[in-house]
Amino acid sequence: MTDIKTALAGLSETAAIQYLTEQFPGAVAFSTSFGQEDQVLADMIWRNKLPVRVFTLDTGRLFQETYELMDLTRARYKQPFETYFPETAAMEKLVAEKGFNSFYDSVENRKECCFIRKRQAHRMAPGRRMEPGQPRPAFRRRQREV
């Protein structure tokens, strides 16, 4: 990790992503939620023709506006992105046992719901801001998702 951190120091975002695609050919993926930061990163990937797989997670809880933006993005860039869905059987079991909104009831239920609804990539470049949401004092430009 230190070697990568050293190699990426001082590189632009585009150059950093290019470096990662060279170090991990075919294994770099970008997870987009279609937020502003994610749209900027997707634009950077597609405009520079970086060999990064772009994907999104449809958790079944997205706003209609998100679906509309997905369609607009697909039409504008004419680039593929994969859409992943939760495993049907696990989702059906969760809803049957705990209802549609169990994640509001407890932290444990929230973690269970997120575990069922979300997927992980081998290497992920999530678009995140440093300032909003929970404090991120240790937020790094690059980090490994586990």
Placement of each model-derived feature along the sequence:
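ATP-dependent adenylation/nucleotidyltransferase module used to activate substrates
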Residues: 1-146
